[in-house]
Structures are given as structure tokens and as C-alpha cells.
Amino acid sequence: MMEVRPTTLIDHINSPADLRALKPEQLPQVCRELRRYILEVLSVTPGHLGSSLGAVDFTVALHYVFDTPYDRIVWDVGHQAYSHKILTGRREDFRHLRQWGGISGFPSPKESEYDTFPAGHASNSISAALGMAVASAAKDEKRKVIAVIGDGSMTGGMAFEGLNNASSFPNNLLIILNDNNMSIDRNVGGLNRYMVDILTSKTYNTIRYDLYKGLRKINLISETNRKNLLRFNNSFKALLARESNLFEGFSIRYFGPVDGNNVLRLVEVLNQIKDMAGPKILHLRTIKGKGYSPAEKQATIWHAPGEFDIKSGERKKGENKPEPPKFQDVFGHTLVELADRDERIVGVTPAMPTGCSMTFLMKKYPNRAYDVGIAEGHAVTFSAGLAKEGLIPFCNIYSSFIQRGYDQVIHDVALSGSHVVICLDRAGLVGEDGATHHGVFDMAFLRCVPDIVVASPLNEHELRNLMLTAYKGYDGPMVIRYPRGKGVLTDWRNTPRLVEIARGRCLTEGEAIAFLSIGPIGNMVQKVVERLAEKGVSAAHYDMVFLKPLDEEMLHGIAKKFDTIISVEDGCIQGGFGSAVMEFMADHDYHPRIRRVGVPDRFIGQGSVPEQYADCGMDADSLLHLTEELLLHP
């Protein structure tokens, strides 16, 4: 007989209105059920676990106190918003999280009206929420706007730009600071709770507001004096609370810290402050992985653990057989090898040391590896400063995040010719993280930058060769892009060798058609060439290696030999590698028939990389079909 799962409270919550119909004393049970459901789904459908478990209580409290979707919640990054998705009509869809045709792992306005603003990258929530609050006030709408931002995102400069601007507006903006990493000193003891109770009480704030209004009415206080009075008030609060607070330096009212995993306390505090005028910050202390002991004890590992057994807490592993390593680990090991050779080599990462395997260098040379926080622009310019003083920085940034440091790449690295090696991790389509995390634009926006070299390795050996070349064979800025996940070689520890800049290679000679590829997608192209050979079609395959500068000598030879060329890249076709090939042909009056294969001009949703390749016509079957069509209709 099939076991029937008992009905729970969340089975009857199809919108926040259903949640608000519950009694306050039922909310702790809702939180427990949400955590249980998140664990149930994520144990077999991997996603971001730790942050989502920690955010359950304040998510429930926000939807209980505020009138969503009329009131707006703007999520920063958004991978902590799983309980938000479950509470807003996507409970059953949650079982297909991050899957092809399923729901995104991040807030997406295309998916739900409750997802008010797209999320995926860090530090933008305050600016977006402030814009919404100002627009609502301009339309005389009484809605409240809430930005939810983690302490990690507060290292991003845009967050401080938003805070600085927010102090100029009187609008009802609430910033929830989700502090789960002890990066902001906490107040302790009974005095702190007493101060929070007083400062959030309606009596205190009514008197405070009425006093200010009265003084303004009789012209005893100007706007400048109001700010001075606010600073005095904040200084008095800091004296009583024994804390100097940077947020109130922006003239933004601060409340907290408050236990962010106590839903009833949160409902109480939110009800007290929700109608207060002006921008304010509620500082919540949460536990990452709350409610699941393994995740609480090892927050980094359980941030996104993959599949796991809920009862034992054991993460599931693949078969115990030799497999290619991740490109990330090849980068990490190779960086350590180079650092062994030259003490000038250092590593820089903006808050992704584990993901990019910079931890290998940190472990062996802790004083030569720098995690600068979520601050990509700073990471690039910091690296340029290191290079200025004679060091050789390897700055590792995810491809989708280098977009946030583009000006610095141009102004602070390329313009000065700094010897900075920028390693773009997770280049190309990345799978389940979806549109916000695909690294598909870098080739298009980097190849137009003067005095910079851009390359992409076919495999792990070539990655090691390019890293050595960037260190020892070239003294200017160089970008090396490579994908997320495993490569193709089990025996990857070659002795690295210098390669010639702007030199590609022919992988397969052929006569009927030429494939030009760049990067690891060339391994798939090579399989297509082999399948064509089985059908009697002689196809050539060239691994270009360098996007900038191109191997022009090789391109001249290809143009003179072939009437039909297919370029293949794991990036956007607008302005990318294929466009560079077409520009070369046009500039030199060659007229071959060229077809570009790559990511089309649209955002690609979440799913597996093979599913995304097929959707974009970048998989082997699509490439084979395209080739046959071109050969049938010369």
C-alpha cells in the first residue's frame, strides 16, 4: 500500500493571502514545514540549500506583515528566495527547480508577479527598491518597498551607492540586512533588546515625527538642521546601544540586530516599523542552514551541496573511477605550481575562492591570495595595482561577473598595459543557474578592447599552457576563458609549455568544409568531424585558441581553400568569435559562405548544458544537420 504524506499547512498556501489568513502562532509550524519541503526537494534536485534554510523565517514574516504583491520585495542575488517561491503559488513547480522547462533558481518577473525584479547578481537590490519607492511616491501610491540584501552583498560598491542616494529621499524604504556570517559586529545582552523595543515602538516614533513636524511648521528647523538633529539622535542611540553604526552615517535609521530565525519576533518588529517614514535598515542575524544540522555546521559545503541523503547528511558521489578533473581544479593546481616557481605570482578572487579553486593557493601561500569580497570592479583595479608594483596577479572572476568590472578592465588594466592575468571561470552556458549566470558575453565585449589578449583552451593541457604563457611568455594583460565543470582528460598533469600568441592549430585536415572553433566546445566539434568522416565527408577542424589577436595566417589559408566555413563558439554570436572571422573575411575581400553557431540573441533559461546546447542549435546533432544542409545546397 502506497504511503500517503500527511497534509500540512503549506499544502493550503497558494498565495501570501492564504498565509496571512493563519494565526500568528501557526507561523513557526509553517517555517518548519517549509524547511522540511526544501530539504526534500533539494536532496534530489540540487540547488542553493544553506542560504534558503536560513531565510525561511524572515521570508514568512515579510509575506505575513506586508501586502504582497502590492507591496514589493526585491531580493538581492535571490538564491535565498526558495521559500518565497513556495509561498507565492509555485509549491508544486518547486519540484522542477532549475530544470529545463521548470522554474528558475532565482527571482524572475517573467515567472511571477511576486518576483518584482530579476536577481542573480549581487548588490543591486537597494538601488532597484529605491527606484520603486520613489516611483510609487510620485504616483501617490502607498505601497511599501523592501530590499532584502545579505551581508556578503554589502561589500559591493553599488550597495553603498544605493544607501547614499536613499538618504536623499523621504520614501518608505525598508532594507532587510540578512547577516548570516558575523561580518557585522553584534550587540548582545538585554540592553540591546530593550533598545530595539524602544526604537521600534510606535510611541517613540510618533513623538519623534510629531516633534520634527512641529519644528518645521514654525520654521525652527531647516533641512540641514534636521540632518544634524538626526546625527545627534543617532549618536545618542549609539551611546546607549554601545555601537557605532555605519548605516546611520548615511542618515538611514537602523534597527537591530534582531534574531532573524524567530518568526514571531520578526512579525512583531516588522509591524512596529513598517509605517515609519523614510529609509530604514532592519539588521537580522540568521544561521545559514538553519534547521538542518549538517548545513549549520559546514555552511560553505552546504551552500550548494548537490544531491544528498537527508537522514545521514551524506552527499552523494559518483562512481569511483578515473574522471577528468574540473577546469577549476586544474586552474587551482596550476596556479600553485606557478607560484612555487615565482614569488611574484599572487591570486585575487571576488568572494569565490572555493568555486574557482583559489583555495589551493590560499592553503599553501595564505599571504599571496586575496579574497576581496563581492567587488569585481575593485578586484580588477586591485590587481592592476599589484601589477604596478611588480607582482603578477591571476585575477579569477566568473565570466558573468566580469561584466561588473568592464570599465576597470579597459581603464585600469588595458590602457596601462598592466601584466594582469584575468581568468574567466564559468565561461559559456553554465546549466542550472540560468540566464543571470551564463558567461556568454565576454568574447563580444572583450575583443574590442585594445592591447589585450583573449584566449580559450581546448582542454586541460591547453589551460596549463596558456597560464604559463600569460605568466612568462607575455608581459601585458591577458584573458583566459574556460567553462564550468569537468574537462576531457584524465591524465591532465602535462609539463606546461609556452605557446605562441595568435597561433591556432589544425586538429583535422579536410577538403569539403572547414570548422573553426574556440575553447572546449571544440571537443564536441571534433566528434562531429569524426561522424562526418564515417559518412565519407572530409571536414577540416581548426582550433583557433586565440580570439584576440586572431591567427590571421591560418585564416588566410582557410579562406583560400574553403568555400564553406562554420564557426562554433560557446558565447553569443552577436559580436563574438564568428563575427570576428566574418570581419576578417570582409576586410580581406574573401567571400566564403559562413555560418555562425553559438548562443542566439536571447536569454537562455535554466536546465542542463546539453539541453541548452540543443536549444541553441549548438549540439552535435544540430551541427551535423547544418553541415549536411550546407553540403547539399552549395
From Swiss-Prot:
Q: Which GO terms describe its molecular function?
A: 1-deoxy-D-xylulose-5-phosphate synthase activity; magnesium ion binding; thiamine pyrophosphate binding
Q: What top-level class of enzyme does the UniProt entry assign?
A: transferase
E.C. code: 2.2.1.7
Q: Which InterPro entries match?
A: Dxylulose-5-P_synthase, THDP-binding, Transketo_C/PFOR_II, Transketolase-like_Pyr-bd, Transketolase_BS, Transketolase_C
Q: Which domain of life is it from?
A: Bacteria
Looking up Pfam families in the UniProt record yields: DXP_synthase_N, Transket_pyr, Transketolase_C
Q: State the GO CC annotations.
A: cytosol
Look up the record and give one Gene Ontology term from the biological process aspect.
Answer: thiamine biosynthetic process
Q: How is the cofactor bound?
A: Binds 1 Mg(2+) ion per subunit.
Matches recorded under Gene3D superfamilies: 3.40.50.920, 3.40.50.970
> Keywords of this protein's UniProt record, alphabetized?
Isoprene biosynthesis, Magnesium, Metal-binding, Thiamine biosynthesis, Thiamine pyrophosphate, Transferase
Q: Mind telling me which SUPFAM superfamilies this protein's record contains?
A: Thiamin diphosphate-binding fold (THDP-binding), TK C-terminal domain-like
What reaction does this enzyme carry out catalytically?
A: D-glyceraldehyde 3-phosphate + pyruvate + H(+) = 1-deoxy-D-xylulose 5-phosphate + CO2
Q: Which cofactor does it need?
A: Mg(2+); thiamine diphosphate
What pathway does the annotation place this protein in? Metabolic intermediate biosynthesis; 1-deoxy-D-xylulose 5-phosphate biosynthesis; 1-deoxy-D-xylulose 5-phosphate from D-glyceraldehyde 3-phosphate and pyruvate: step 1/1
Where Mg(2+) is bound, by residue?
D151, N180
Residues annotated for thiamine diphosphate binding in this entry: H79, G120, H121, A122, G152, S153, N180, Y292, E376
Q: How does it assemble?
A: Homodimer.
The family annotation for this protein states: Belongs to the transketolase family. DXPS subfamily.
This chain's function reads:
Catalyzes the acyloin condensation reaction between C atoms 2 and 3 of pyruvate and glyceraldehyde 3-phosphate to yield 1-deoxy-D-xylulose-5-phosphate (DXP).
Q: What is this protein called?
A: 1-deoxy-D-xylulose-5-phosphate synthase
Recorded source organism is Porphyromonas gingivalis (strain ATCC 33277 / DSM 20709 / CIP 103683 / JCM 12257 / NCTC 11834 / 2561)
Instruction: Give the gene name.
Output: dxs
